[in-house]
Design a protein with these regions (language model features):
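Positions that flank functional sites
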Residues: 215, 250, 266
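DNA major-groove recognition helix of helix-turn-helix
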Residues: 199, 211, 249-251, 262
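Amphipathic alpha-helical "recognition" segments
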Residues: 208-213, 217-219
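A generic alpha-helix surface/boundary motif
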Residues: 193-194, 214
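Alpha-helical bundle regulatory/interaction domains
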Residues: 1-192, 202-206, 221-225, 230-241, ...
């Protein structure tokens, strides 16, 4: 199981975490670890005319998101994304496990880099009421409970294939020596084709894309938090044959080289 306190505190997926507005991760509600990895809850109140751009290298997964204007299922991203925040607002999101996504969409490949509006007025009202509480911490916790109660009622326990897809996610996310699809197949004791089917059905991305996303997230984190490490050192630690291959993957997904990312970091972006 990959959801834990340490993971709640890390900055993977967020390219400039210190530029975020108020942002909290909450653990998955009790009994829902197989369906929800964690909850994420940002809130912001920015000066008039000010825009805060949040740049994200998303996890290879989908999110259920409740915002003031409704509920959406945000599908798996194939590239870096951003959102421009202004004024005041909030969101309550659940990073979904593969087993949960299968019950919300039959083919998540169709919602890559897209959002699907969900007709869930009761969930929206309950979370919005929670987030309107004067005491923000109590509001977050109440919103998390409401979303958890909805998930418990709406999403069944993982199927056998869903549990296997979760195990695949756990393996890829936690073992940085995994760099090729045949390694996943061997560890799960299924065929390469079986891994491909699991990834397509339960995540909506090719398995190699899932592997590379986790490695790129880790690469970005280390480039940001360990400025004395060379790009070549990071590449070697993450199983790349050389830094050129890491740089190529980095450019393909993020649109810029690892060295450019490191140069874009100011003193306030580092721990």
């Amino acid at each position: 199981m990959i959801g834990n306190t340490v993971e709640l505190d890390d900055g993977r997926g967020i390219l400039y975490p210190r530029r975020l507005p108020t942002f909290h991760r909450e653990p998955a509600p009790t009994g829902l670890d197989d369906l929800i990895r964690w909850l994420w809850i940002p809130r912001w109140s920015l000066p008039e005319g000010f825009v805060s751009r949040q740049e994200i290298l998303p996890f290879p997964a989908s999110n259920l998101v409740v915002e003031p204007d409704g509920v959406t299922l945000a599908g798996p991203a194939t590239r870096v994304s951003h959102r421009d925040l202004s004024g005041s607002g909030w969101a309550v999101g659940a990073l979904l496990r593969p087993a949960a996504l299968a019950h919300l969409h039959s083919d998540p490949r169709l919602i890559q880099d897209d959002q699907l509006v969900l007709d869930e007025p009761d969930l929206h009202l309950a979370v919005a009421n929670a987030m309107s509480r004067a005491e923000e911490r109590a509001g977050r916790q109440c919103a998390a409970r409401e979303l958890g109660q909805w998930a418990a009622a709406r999403l069944p326990a993982p199927s056998q294939d869903g549990a296997l897809a979760n195990a695949m996610e756990d393996l890829i996310a936690s073992d940085r020596t995994i760099v090729r699809v045949p390694q996943v197949a061997e560890r799960l004791r299924i065929s390469v084709r079986g891994v491909q089917r699991l990834a397509q059905r339960f995540i909506g991305l090719a398995p190699l894309a899932v592997i590379r996303r986790y490695r790129l997230q880790e690469a970005a984190r280390r480039l940001r938090e360990e400025p004395d490490l060379t790009v070549a050192h990071v590449a070697a630690d993450l199983g790349y044959s050389d830094h050129a291959h890491l740089s190529a993957d980095f450019r393909r997904v993020l649109g810029f080289a690892p060295s450019s990312y490191r140069h874009s970091l100011g003193a306030h972006d580092r721990p």
